Design a protein with these regions (language model features):
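Short proline/glycine- and polar residue-rich coil/turn motifs
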Residues: 39-48
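Intrinsic-disorder/low-complexity, polar/charged segments enriched in Ser/Thr/Lys/Arg/Asp/Glu/Gln
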Residues: 7-9, 19, 49-51, 68, ...
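Signal that preferentially marks extracellular ectodomain short beta-strand elements
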Residues: 49-65
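Surface-exposed loop/turn motifs at beta-strand-loop junctions within extracellular Ig-like
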Residues: 26, 58, 75-77
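Glycine-centered coil/turn sites that cap beta-strands in beta-rich domains
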Residues: 3-28, 34-38
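Residue-level detector of beta-strand face positions
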Residues: 23, 53-55, 70-72
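C-terminal tail/sorting-segment detector
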Residues: 17, 34, 62-88
Length: 88
């Protein structure tokens, strides 16, 4: 999902069913957005219909500033963190 403007999809795979949550943080470690997907079956979540969608906005609906962000995907005990860039 790099770079993107103003929205992105974050693809992921689950090896087993789990509760899935994605949090987006700015580079100061502040949580910008949380997306709770709930309990999902094992499988590939790669297309626009399945991947995590982030509209580039914070929790109150304001557009996030240009810059580097980190998303954290949690699925059961699994945690993945990756950087992404909003370029406006």
């Amino acid at each position: 999902p790099n770079p993107f403007n103003p929205e992105t999809w974050i693809p992921f795979d689950l090896s087993e069913a789990a509760d899935v949550t994605v949090r987006v943080y700015d580079m100061q470690g502040r949580e910008v957005r949380r997306v709770a997907l709930g309990y999902l079956d094992a499988g590939a979540y790669r297309g626009r219909a399945d991947a995590v969608y982030w509209d580039g906005r914070n929790e109150v609906g304001e557009p996030a500033a240009s810059g580097v962000y980190v998303y954290e995907l949690r699925a059961g005990e699994f945690v993945e963190r990756r950087r992404m860039v909003i370029r406006k």
